[in-house]
């Protein structure tokens, strides 16, 4: 693997830099699919807790042992040494996921990063059918040293890019070439 340098990774760098500079986190709209996934995750974790092992829900977990602060929001921790990552899948996609019998590529980094941050030696990847009514697939994932090294390198590169973006922004403000006005913060209106 290699460290991403694409539109998505560049946007993530700018989001981190802007959060640090402004102190604000941008809100994102919740779509129907996102809400369904959230609801399915909660239900699946109840089933897992009942049939496999209790899951402790946690907030944001951090780790600074790699020379910088990294963090993640795992779906849950299991006992003293494990964790879970739950993904809700439309039934046809769940069928293919079960046939393939592996963690889908789009979730591997997330699972391994959760293990890296938490320092836990295993993670259960849970793939569940949307709205239930089918088979939940559990795959136990253990750390991969090459993935761990790549993630640590990527975290350092991300931090370098965030710092560079912040410096470029501050330099642009200081050089006087733009007309800039301070904007007061406006709180979003919440409608019922």
Model-derived features: where do they sit?
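Accessory terminal regions of nucleic-acid processing enzymes
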Residues: 1-192
């Amino acid at each position: 693997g290699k460290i991403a340098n694409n539109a998505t990774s560049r946007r993530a760098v700018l989001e981190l830099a802007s959060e640090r500079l402004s102190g604000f986190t941008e809100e994102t709209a919740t779509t129907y699919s996102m809400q369904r996934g959230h609801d399915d995750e909660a239900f699946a974790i109840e089933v897992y807790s009942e049939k496999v092992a209790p899951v402790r829900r946690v907030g944001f977990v951090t780790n600074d042992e790699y020379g910088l602060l990294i963090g993640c929001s795992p779906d849950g921790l299991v006992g003293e040494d494990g964790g879970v990552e739950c993904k809700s899948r439309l039934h046809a996609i769940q069928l293919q996921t079960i046939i393939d019998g592996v963690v889908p590529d789009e979730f591997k980094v997330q699972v391994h990063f959760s293990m890296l941050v938490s320092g836990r030696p295993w993670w259960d990847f849970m793939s569940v059918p949307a709205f239930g009514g089918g088979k939940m697939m559990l795959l136990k994932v253990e750390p991969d040293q090459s993935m761990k090294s790549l993630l640590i390198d990527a975290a350092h590169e991300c931090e370098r890019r965030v710092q560079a973006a912040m410096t470029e922004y501050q330099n642009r403000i200081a050089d006087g070439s733009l007309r800039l006005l301070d904007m007061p913060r406006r709180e979003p209106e919440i409608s019922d």
